[in-house]
Amino acid sequence: MSKVKKNDETLSEVLVDVNRVTKVVKGGRSFAFSAYVVVGDKAGRVGAGHGKAKEVNEARGKAKQAAKKRMMKVPLYQNRTIHHDVVGKSGAAKVILRRAKAGTGVIAGGSMRAIFDSLGIHDVVAKSIGSTNVYAMISATFDALNKLASPKSIAMRRDKKVNEISVKSADIQVNE
């Protein structure tokens, strides 16, 4: 997806992970904090970023700035779910995202739920397979979101009309 201009006042921020990291130096150990943040406007734009600093708040601020730099636009179906089922991978992590009927809600694990809430998705079913590492799962989720396409963009790519394209969940096969 394409990069998007950011607007600070409309962005929601979710702190996904905070770790204390240690660097061993000649005089002993040096401690710092690592933070992972997901930001979004709840209307189809989302980004994730990582920051490291001596204090938690500084690390969180750096992570938020990194997330705003990496924001992307995701096409939503009826402003509540994704257009089609998709699989994303990152290392040993694999996520399967499936569109859901209205009223289903967000059925997803911790870090994926933060992404969907920041994105503004209300109905989706997500399954993680393999690694449950927070960084890998978020990366795999973003890989899946990058593969999403609206019927309009698919039709333009194929030089067809939107009504000539049919996307059914049953037609998509997921290799596990």
Curated annotation (Swiss-Prot):
GO biological process, one term: translation
Top-level taxon in the UniProt lineage: Bacteria
Pfam families, sorted: Ribosomal_S5, Ribosomal_S5_C
Keyword entries, A-Z: Ribonucleoprotein, Ribosomal protein, RNA-binding, rRNA-binding
GO MF terms held by the record: rRNA binding; structural constituent of ribosome
UniProt entry tagged with the keyword DNA repair: no
Keyword Nucleus: no
Free-text note regarding domains: The N-terminal domain interacts with the head of the 30S subunit; the C-terminal domain interacts with the body and contacts protein S4. The interaction surface between S4 and S5 is involved in control of translational fidelity.
Subunit structure: Part of the 30S ribosomal subunit. Contacts proteins S4 and S8.
Cited NCBIfam families: rpsE_bact (TIGR01021)
Protein name: Small ribosomal subunit protein uS5
Source organism: Rickettsia rickettsii (strain Sheila Smith)
